[in-house]
């Protein structure tokens, strides 16, 4: 089984992202099949964007829109079987009470219904500060919202002191999208706390080959193949420290070296 690999534009300089053709050139030149990070607010805008991507043999992944119905329709038109619901955020970064969980889950339910109507899997980002942040959050939220799918983000799970492989082993058939990235911290032998104000002074997301917190990238990808995962794997690196063309090329080359 072949995994489909996309480049995510999170962290790319605005002057590059605003030049869509330049984005396509970089992504295609680095060897990716798709690109994630674009949005559209009308069918006409989507047509222009999709036509440009097609010139480079690229697929548009998880296209965003402010409107839930528009997002569902745009993605199903592209043949995407999954798209992202709007993130629900924890209050003050703490785990919600049962009542607060119900309050946060409420706005997600109509989004789940809208996406499901069109055969689009509604996924929520596993992300620091959001409703889904840790392995324990996944267990609790999926029980409360059984129609929700996971955006499996390896970097955010690591930053939250959760093991991405635990999530993959427990919910292999509930993953609808993947953000693959690594995590680096100044002293990996000491337990880090992403909720401390100075956390990002000593920790960061990093190149796939650069992490020092135990992520086995090949094991993650092998696990997705074993689970017969049919979605996209987007390579993401928030706040890259080098030129994005070099970073995304190096990350793609790293995947090739481990068989992907």
Name every feature range the model reports, one short phrase each.
Residues 12-18, 34-48, 64-71, 92-95, ...:
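Acidic-and-aromatic substrate-binding clefts and catalytic sites of carbohydrate-active enzymes
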Residues 115-210:
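Acidic/histidine-rich catalytic cores of soluble enzymes
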Residues 3-9, 35-37, 58-64, 83-85, ...:
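Hydrophobic faces of well-ordered beta-strands that scaffold small-molecule active sites
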Residues 231-258:
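C-terminal/domain-terminus segments
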Residues 20-24, 43-50, 68-73, 105-112, ...:
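Generic structural signal for well-ordered alpha-helices
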Residues 30, 110-121, 145, 219-230, ...:
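A structural motif corresponding to the C-terminal end of an alpha-helix
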Residues 1-78, 147-149, 252-260:
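N-terminal pre-domain/capping segments
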Residues 59, 67-152, 159, 245:
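Active-site acidic/histidine proton-transfer and metal-coordination neighborhood
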């Amino acid at each position: 089984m072949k995994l489909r690999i996309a480049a995510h534009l999170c962290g790319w300089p605005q002057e590059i992202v605003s030049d869509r053709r330049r984005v396509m050139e970089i992504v295609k030149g680095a060897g990716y099949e798709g690109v994630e990070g674009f949005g559209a607010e009308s069918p006409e805008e989507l047509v222009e964007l999709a036509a440009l991507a097609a010139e480079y043999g690229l697929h548009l992944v998880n296209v965003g829109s402010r409107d839930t119905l528009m997002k569902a329709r745009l993605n199903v038109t592209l043949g995407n079987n999954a798209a992202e619901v709007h993130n629900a955020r924890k209050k003050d970064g703490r785990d919600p009470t049962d009542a607060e969980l119900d309050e946060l889950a409420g706005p997600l339910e109509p989004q789940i219904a809208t996406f499901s109507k069109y055969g689009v899997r509604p996924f929520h980002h596993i992300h620091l500060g959001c409703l889904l942040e840790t392995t324990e959050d996944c267990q609790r939220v999926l029980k409360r919202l059984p129609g929700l799918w996971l955006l499996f983000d390896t970097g955010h799970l690591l930053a939250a002191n959760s093991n991405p492989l635990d999530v993959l082993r427990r919910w292999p058939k509930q993953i609808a999208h993947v953000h693959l990235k690594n995590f680096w911290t100044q002293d990996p032998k000491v337990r880090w706390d992403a909720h401390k104000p100075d956390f990002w002074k000593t920790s960061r997301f990093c190149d796939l080959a650069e992490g020092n917190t135990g992520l086995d990238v090949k094991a993650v990808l092998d696990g997705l193949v074993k689970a017969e995962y049919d979605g996209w794997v987007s390579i993401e690196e928030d706040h890259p420290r080098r030129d994005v063309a070099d970073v995304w090329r190096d990350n793609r080359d790293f995947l090739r070296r481990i068989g992907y």
